[in-house]
């Protein structure tokens, strides 16, 4: 077992403080509209330029193992806030440093760390309740655009694109961010159910120019096994041909005699048909086929459910207003399924998302929900250079998450103003605490609430304490607009923060800072000293 280096009490806390401060100094310069960029060296390719707090935090690794523990704990604050709300990572880091620094001063002066932590936790609960009270729901397209614009570092183009995407795909829709090939940042919206499986033969294409197969008022056959022979398949094909409507076939695979028959039918000008493979794999494939069945009002023909392809009838087939199939993907527009069944399916998927512990599973479930309930929007980010594109893509990601958070829990006056407006409520709560050290813990939170505003002011080249006093003396929604160096009504000016982001930042910061304050010992491995390299042989590497 490797020997360990152990630090105790004051020495341990000083090491943690140095690690916390080092990480926080790198992260907090990015806060606010006049925050600076951080350039991160990469082992390959060009350096990364970012203003995203969690991206900066993730890159920090300190040489001193004890100091690194403090840095890693604050890194956890940024990561947890990003996981919960998708934004607010820099605010969370600033709050964590403020709570820990002030808390450490009081512990050194003799306060009981456990009582301090209890006081911090009680104060955070009071502030969170107040945040919920003062938040207001997002009601307009304009407010969504404003939240996204602020989170994208005051880029109105990104803000408007995200608001447009949210409007088109709805609350449950999926917005994905990709890199564009050109300079322009554009929005593509795919309405209806879309999956990445194209037609099995180009003979199915109905439009030779676009190489797409477009089926209007189509029937949809959904089968979970391979179709190779024609015998079992023929009865349902004959019924469809008699109905005169086009047919989309979705199955695990269609091959051999079955595929050949369908292709020959198309070449001879028979009824319009298109065959595609089922999306996904394993259990996910079955779930997606069930989704398609509910969306189109059909049934999944599955032998597991006692259904055979040879017994399939028109009543079992789904219906869609339009189906568009290209070489790469299939889109089902306006499926004719019952709204009640569709809503129940969406609720079931939402429950699975809540219960899932895997990020990958959550992402796939979210995709399914989006496809069922509204559609998928793709924002393609363009820029002149790869470095600029990556930086812009980070900002689009932040803005997207902030917007989703705003829709979930409402909005607050931004620029750190909302936390300032919670100070009077917390001051009124202090006399209710009978334990002196708990009261000190609550005062630590009280002081920390002004830290984000002061940092925004400092990054704008102003004196934080003066700006704080000015904001404190003003009415509810009035705050400091660092971009324009003016005091204004933050809601009217469109400087908004999602309530979920502010709440998550404070909760994560207080949680980790409280743990650090109650730490009395640090244990780390003693780094091994590498033996010095052997001296070079005389004359080595010389030509004679």
Curated annotation (Swiss-Prot):
Keywords: ATP-binding, Chaperone, Cytoplasm, Isomerase, Nucleotide-binding, Stress response. Its EC number is 5.6.1.7. Belongs to the chaperonin (HSP60) family. ATP binds at residues 30-33, 51, 87-91, 415, 481-483, 497. InterPro entries: Chaperonin_Cpn60_CS, Cpn60/GroEL, Cpn60/GroEL/TCP-1, GroEL-like_apical_dom_sf, GROEL-like_equatorial_sf, TCP-1-like_intermed_sf. CDD domains: GroEL. Forms a cylinder of 14 subunits composed of two heptameric rings stacked back-to-back. Interacts with the co-chaperonin GroES. The keyword Isomerase applies. One of its GO terms (cellular component) is cytoplasm. GO terms for biological process: protein refolding. The gene is groEL. This is Chaperonin GroEL. SUPFAM superfamilies: GroEL apical domain-like, GroEL equatorial domain-like, GroEL-intermediate domain like. It catalyses: ATP + H2O + a folded polypeptide = ADP + phosphate + an unfolded polypeptide. Induction: By stress. It is found in: Cytoplasm. Together with its co-chaperonin GroES, plays an essential role in assisting protein folding. The GroEL-GroES system forms a nano-cage that allows encapsulation of the non-native substrate proteins and provides a physical environment optimized to promote and accelerate protein folding. It comes from Chlamydia muridarum (strain MoPn / Nigg).
């Amino acid at each position: 077992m490797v020997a360990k280096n152990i630090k105790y009490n004051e020495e341990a806390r000083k090491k943690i403080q140095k690690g916390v401060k080092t990480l926080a100094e790198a992260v907090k310069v990015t806060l606010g509209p006049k925050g600076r960029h951080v350039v991160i060296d990469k082992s390959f390719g060009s350096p990364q330029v970012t203003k995203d707090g969690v991206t900066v935090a993730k890159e920090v690794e300190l040489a001193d193992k004890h100091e690194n523990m403090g840095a890693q704990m604050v890194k956890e604050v940024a990561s947890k806030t990003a996981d919960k709300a998708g934004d607010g990572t820099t605010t969370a880091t600033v709050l964590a440093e403020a709570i820990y620094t002030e808390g450490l001063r009081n512990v050194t002066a003799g306060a009981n760390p456990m009582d301090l932590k209890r006081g911090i936790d009680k104060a955070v609960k009071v502030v969170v309740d107040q945040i919920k009270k003062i938040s207001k729901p997002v009601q307009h397209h304009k407010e969504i655009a404003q939240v996204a614009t602020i989170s994208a570092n005051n880029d109105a183009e990104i803000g408007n694109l995200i608001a447009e995407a949210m409007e088109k795909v709805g609350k449950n829709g999926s917005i994905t961010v990709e890199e564009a090939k050109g300079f322009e940042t554009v929005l593509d919206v795919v309405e209806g159910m879309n999956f990445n499986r194209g037609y099995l033969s180009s003979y199915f294409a109905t439009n030779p120019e676009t190489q797409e197969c477009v089926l209007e008022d189509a029937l949809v056959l959904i089968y979970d096994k391979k179709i190779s022979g024609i015998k079992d398949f023929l009865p349902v094909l004959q019924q469809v041909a008699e109905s005169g409507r086009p047919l989309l076939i979705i199955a695990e695979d269609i091959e051999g005699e079955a595929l050949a028959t369908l292709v020959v039918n198309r070449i001879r000008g028979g009824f319009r048909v298109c065959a595609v493979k089922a999306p996904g794999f394993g259990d996910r494939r079955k779930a997606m086929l069930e989704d398609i069945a509910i969306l189109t009002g059909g049934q999944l023909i599955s032998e597991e459910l006692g259904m055979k392809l040879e017994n399939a009838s028109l009543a079992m087939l789904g219906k869609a207003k339009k189906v568009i199939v290209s070489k790469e993907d299939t889109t089902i527009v306006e499926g004719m399924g019952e709204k009640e069944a569709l809503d129940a399916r969406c609720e079931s998927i939402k429950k699975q998302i809540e219960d899932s512990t895997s990020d990958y599973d959550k992402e796939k479930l979210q995709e399914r929900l989006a496809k069922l309930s509204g559609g998928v929007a793709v924002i393609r980010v363009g820029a002149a250079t790869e470095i600029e594109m990556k930086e812009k893509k980070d900002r689009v990601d932040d803005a997207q998450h902030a917007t989703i958070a705003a829709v979930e829990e409402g909005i607050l006056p931004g620029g750190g103003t909302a936390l300032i407006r919670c100070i009077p409520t917390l001051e009124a709560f202090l006399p209710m605490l009978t334990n002196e050290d708990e009261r000190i813990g609550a005062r630590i939170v009280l002081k920390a609430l002004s830290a984000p505003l002061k940092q925004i002011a400092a990054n704008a080249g102003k004196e934080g304490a003066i700006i704080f006093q000015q904001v404190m003396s003003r009415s509810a929604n009035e705050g400091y607009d660092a971009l324009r160096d003016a005091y204004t009504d933050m809601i009217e000016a469109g400087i908004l923060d999602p309530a979920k982001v502010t709440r998550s930042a404070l909760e994560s910061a207080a949680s980790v800072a409280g743990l650090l304050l109650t730490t009395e010992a640090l244990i780390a491995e003693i780094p091994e000293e590498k033996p010095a390299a052997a001296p070079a042989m005389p004359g080595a590497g010389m030509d004679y």
